[in-house]
């Protein structure tokens, strides 16, 4: 600490965050989506909503300075923190000293999420630039039962969107296929240092592991169907390599208009189409 910053200040206070960055010669890296939380109420709300509790295995992606990490560990969770930025090694060695936290250094997009123990909960302030790919990996990892994450408000809206709504797309469909989405709260720009360009939201996704996992072939079909969500479903499927006549017959059999837009089609109807087109048996 500098002489001007009393040690009684919480780690998430702007003064402590600036002090850490200054002493370690660091500047937040925009390319890594580094915006550090400086609001204790929001930190506690994320940990609470995520279910951090004694003995619960928790994965945090992008611990940054260790602010949320400490809150999770303080609640007794067994925390694994996955960090890519090697510059933060001395920072986390300082801020997580004495904490029950395992820090894994590496790229979150290359981590083996299937290796996580059953009952794992993801609780994280996700790097915004890889939010979609990370959420898809969480959904498909059998050991992860929930993900409570801080994301761009626009992404939160897409996750909860239903067919027919303006922001419905493949990410919305994925979330519905694997479980449910709950909006926890919005987070203003001023809760971060540095402040991001957009408003954020905390959402919780619960994954129903008792439900059979979607077939890989069906996931690819849904992705192709929603690739250009405002175009007609017929055009999207033709672009994906399905014959126009076969698509027309499948749409008719499913009771769908030939000009129906992809974003308006429920997953149940897409499954019917997938069967009609030989994607599923």
From Swiss-Prot:
Gene: rsmA
Function: Specifically dimethylates two adjacent adenosines (A1518 and A1519) in the loop of a conserved hairpin near the 3'-end of 16S rRNA in the 30S particle. May play a critical role in biogenesis of 30S subunits.
EC number: 2.1.1.182
Name of the protein in its database record: Ribosomal RNA small subunit methyltransferase A
GO molecular function ontology, one term from the record: 16S rRNA (adenine(1518)-N(6)/adenine(1519)-N(6))-dimethyltransferase activity
Family the UniProt entry places it in: Belongs to the class I-like SAM-binding methyltransferase superfamily. rRNA adenine N(6)-methyltransferase family. RsmA subfamily.
Enzyme class, first EC level, given as a word: transferase
Binding residues annotated for S-adenosyl-L-methionine, in chain numbering: 35, 37, 62, 83, 107, 125
Catalytic activity line of the entry: adenosine(1518)/adenosine(1519) in 16S rRNA + 4 S-adenosyl-L-methionine = N(6)-dimethyladenosine(1518)/N(6)-dimethyladenosine(1519) in 16S rRNA + 4 S-adenosyl-L-homocysteine + 4 H(+)
GO cellular component terms given for this protein: cytosol
Keywords linked to the UniProt accession: Cytoplasm, Methyltransferase, RNA-binding, rRNA processing, S-adenosyl-L-methionine, Transferase
Compartments where found: Cytoplasm
């Amino acid at each position: 600490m500098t002489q001007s910053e009393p040690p009684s200040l919480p780690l998430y206070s702007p003064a402590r965050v600036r002090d850490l960055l200054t002493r370690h010669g660091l500047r937040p890296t925009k390319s890594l989506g580094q915006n550090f939380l400086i609001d204790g109420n929001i930190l506690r709300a994320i940990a609470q909503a995520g279910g951090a509790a004694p003995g619960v295995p928790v994965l945090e992606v992008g611990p940054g300075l260790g602010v949320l990490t400490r809150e999770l560990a303080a609640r007794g969770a067994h925390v694994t923190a996955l960090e890519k930025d090697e510059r933060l090694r001395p920072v986390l060695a300082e801020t997580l000293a004495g904490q029950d936290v395992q820090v894994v250094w590496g790229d979150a997009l290359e981590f083996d999420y299937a290796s996580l123990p059953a009952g794992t909960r993801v609780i994280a302030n996700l790097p915004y630039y890889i939010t979609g790919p990370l959420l898809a990996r969480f959904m498909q990892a059998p050991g992860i039962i929930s993900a409570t994450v801080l994301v761009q408000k626009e992404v939160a809206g897409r996750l909860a969107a239903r067919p027919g709504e303006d922001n419905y797309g493949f990410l919305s469909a994925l979330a519905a296929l694997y479980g449910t989405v709950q909006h926890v709260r919005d987070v203003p720009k001023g809760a971060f240092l540095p402040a991001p360009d957009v408003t954020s939201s905390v959402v919780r996704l619960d994954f129903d592991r008792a439900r059979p996992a979607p077939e890989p072939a069906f996931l690819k079909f849904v992705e192709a169907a929603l690739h250009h969500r405002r175009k007609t479903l017929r055009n999207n499927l033709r672009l994906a390599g399905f014959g126009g006549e076969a698509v027309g017959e499948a749409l008719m059999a499913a009771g769908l208009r030939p000009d129906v837009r992809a974003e308006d089609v429920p997953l149940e109807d897409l499954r019917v189409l997938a069967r009609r087109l030989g994607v599923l048996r």
